[in-house]
């Protein structure tokens, strides 16, 4: 339906474009009563002012939105750069997950939001990678010999910094909220000032104000013209009216004189009665001042107030003294408790420190012993490896020796089998001798080689047996060393578990220390508050004593003043006669003024009676003009449909203004057309205004 209406509007605008170009602008009338065109002009200008205020709000919102967008874009660029840096760091270090390494989850902050999207998944991945890199580095960089005093000092410094930062944060948040509220107030004031400026510069409002002021002027001018016309008519019609006016004037003067006489008599009677009262009161006061008693002083209001104030001050001083004594006792008790707690904590910390140092020394000694045993075992292992290699070479030599012996035996058997006596007999004696010598030399060489090989084999066998014995001994020592190693590892595990327990105890003790530090700070704050209150009480006591002394001095001054007043009384009696004379002069002046007032009142009554006469003759035309102007103003401000409610909703399609109730009723009844021009509108075309 709204889409069809928009189409109709576009069609109508396109058809009537040429007519709108030649259509003259609306003009506000400058004088005379307000017309219907002036009312329409007034409505349009009100809508224009409201649209300008909406535009200003929109510009402010767009400016804020642009600032937020620029901040968002800069933050997104920074996040992308930081992500690339972290990715390059992770790639440089290389992420390799190890099963033995425990991730320290307290290093990096976890994500707080529950729904995990793409960005949250990426951040979780980066966090896991950084934890795998940082946790082993932090574990390796932890020192075993940590000084507790340094740790406690650092904790105290950090706690102090945290407290200061919290206080600064609270103050800054309060300042921020105050500045935000001030900025909102200033924006609202600026908008109201802009609206007021628009209303001041609007022609229609100036025209209405002029019409309202001109209405009163018109009434006065009309009354004056009526008077002049009446006078003219009376002079033309009847010349005897002058005599009537003179008669009325004389009668009014006589009445004025009578009223003046009556006022003079009343004022004289009042003056006489007042004079008698004043004389009596003066005599009574003089008698009282001459004969002042203690009862009069006690019954005096100032004396009672001073006495009550003195009592209150004494009671407050006593109460403050009691409170001071109780606070001093509490302070002493708190100081004693604080010293006892400090001594206990120092004792416990020293004992725990000594036990930890002893356990650490034991573990270091055991570690040195285990390392020496390990080094010995490694050296023996290298020796055994070398001996094992020598044994393999000996086995190979023995195999070679066996092969050579077998070869010699085979050659000898062949020699015996192939040796023919016929050949030997064929040889000569010299050849036989040479051959025998050669054989003897060969036999000697063979025997020598055999002996050498035999000695080598025997020495090798001896060394092998020695090595086997050594291996057996070393295996026994190795088993012993393994047992010692396993025992030391068990001891190491127990020490590591004890170390963890001690670490947890140290953490608990540190938490207790931090809690005790907080308690100490709170106690110190309380002590400071109590000392301040004690000082305040002392100051109050001193001030009370000073006030008491001042009151005593004031009482003495009152006694002195009493004597001086008695002296002044005689002087006052002398002055009384002067005052009586002044009183008579004042009474005369007052009587004269009363006479003047009576005359003026009588003139006012006479003028009012004349005005009533003139108003009864010619006031119908003025009243009709006033009614017309009032109806015009009502038509501007009241709804033309129901004529009950004020106009507060404008239809932006045609510019007509009605009340919100009538527009909503028409929308609910699906009568979506303007009652005056019959143009279609929707709920989006309504605009709330303030006339």
Curated annotation (Swiss-Prot):
Lineage: superkingdom: Eukaryota
Instruction: Give its E.C. classification number.
Output: 2.3.2.27
* Zinc finger feature spans (RING-type): 639-678
Biased region (Basic and acidic residues) positions are 1-19, 217-231
Q: Which SUPFAM superfamilies match?
A: RING/U-box (SSF57850)
Q: Which gene encodes it?
A: BRE1
Catalytic activity annotation: S-ubiquitinyl-[E2 ubiquitin-conjugating enzyme]-L-cysteine + [acceptor protein]-L-lysine = [E2 ubiquitin-conjugating enzyme]-L-cysteine + N(6)-ubiquitinyl-[acceptor protein]-L-lysine
**Protein name (record):** E3 ubiquitin-protein ligase BRE1
State the residue spans of region: Disordered.
1-24, 211-231
Give all cystine bridges in this chain. none
